[in-house]
């Protein structure tokens, strides 16, 4: 256990004042490297097993991997990633460490954290500025550059991977036979360039759906195009 606490500290996670208790709760934003830390734990501690409610690792013969939550079996040192996608009542008591991005989860599913990290290696300062304005967060980036642009879905063509937020956008994309993912389907995924379709202004999205908005705004590593009903009113 002490080794895991040391790993978290050495990777930049900040220890809160919350007393140690089971499970140890780790909150880290998208692209912070929490999956890297979990894989390091698996590599260093042979009895550790990790599962996720997001995207599992590909199968590997040589390295321990983060498995899908559906494969969960109780062990001696169980770790869960993206725990925020799971209601409290469904969280198994055997998990020693649980991780999530709190902005990507319904607030009702969140515990108070023992460790936090709001530094990302995925996207750049423009995305951080948008997120901090929309979510009153304090996210910073070690990436020096990224691009965010806005446009009308009727005037601008999508680029890269297409993500859709809200049913109205699903219908439009289906009518145009454009391949897309719903934002609820892409936790743990990332692409260089993403187009996100919105049905309303960011500021008008209901509180209960804002964790899905955060997912949609953080899947890119280089460029994000936001297409909404009013190109000049899609920003917060």
From Swiss-Prot:
Keywords, sorted A to Z: Host cytoplasm, Host-virus interaction, Inhibition of host innate immune response by virus, RNA-binding, Suppressor of RNA silencing, Transport, Viral immunoevasion, Viral movement protein
Compartments where found: Host cytoplasm
GO aspect biological process, one term: symbiont-mediated suppression of host innate immune response
(+)RNA virus helicase C-terminal domain ranges (all copies): 118-236
Main location: host cell
Similarity annotation: Belongs to the Tymovirales TGBp1 protein family.
Protein name: Movement and silencing protein TGBp1
Source organism (scientific name): White clover mosaic virus (strain O)
Organism taxonomic ancestry: Viruses, Riboviria, Orthornavirae, Kitrinoviricota, Alsuviricetes
């Amino acid at each position: 256990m002490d080794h895991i606490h040391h790993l978290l500290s050495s990777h930049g996670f900040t220890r809160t004042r919350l007393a140690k208790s089971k499970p140890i709760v780790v909150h880290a934003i998208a692209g912070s490297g929490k999956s890297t830390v979990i894989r390091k734990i698996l590599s260093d501690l042979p009895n550790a097993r990790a599962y996720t409610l997001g995207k599992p690792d590909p199968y590997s013969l040589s390295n321990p991997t983060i498995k899908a939550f559906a494969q969960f079996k109780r062990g001696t040192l169980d770790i869960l990633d993206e725990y925020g996608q799971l209601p409290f009542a469904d969280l198994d008591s055997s998990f020693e460490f649980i991780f999530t991005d709190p902005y990507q989860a319904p607030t009702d599913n969140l515990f108070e954290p023992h460790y936090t990290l709001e530094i990302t290696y995925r996207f750049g300062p423009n995305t951080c500025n948008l997120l901090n304005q929309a979510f009153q967060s304090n996210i910073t980036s070690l990436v020096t550059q990224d691009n965010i642009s806005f446009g009308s879905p009727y005037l601008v063509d999508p680029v890269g991977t297409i993500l859709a937020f809200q049913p109205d956008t699903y219908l439009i994309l289906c009518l145009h036979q454009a391949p897309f993912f719903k934002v609820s389907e892409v936790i743990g995924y990332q692409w260089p360039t993403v187009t996100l379709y919105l049905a309303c202004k960011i500021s008008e999205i209901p509180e209960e759906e804002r964790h899905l908005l955060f997912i949609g705004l953080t899947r890119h590593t280089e460029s994000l195009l936001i297409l909404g009903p009013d190109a000049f009113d899609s920003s917060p």
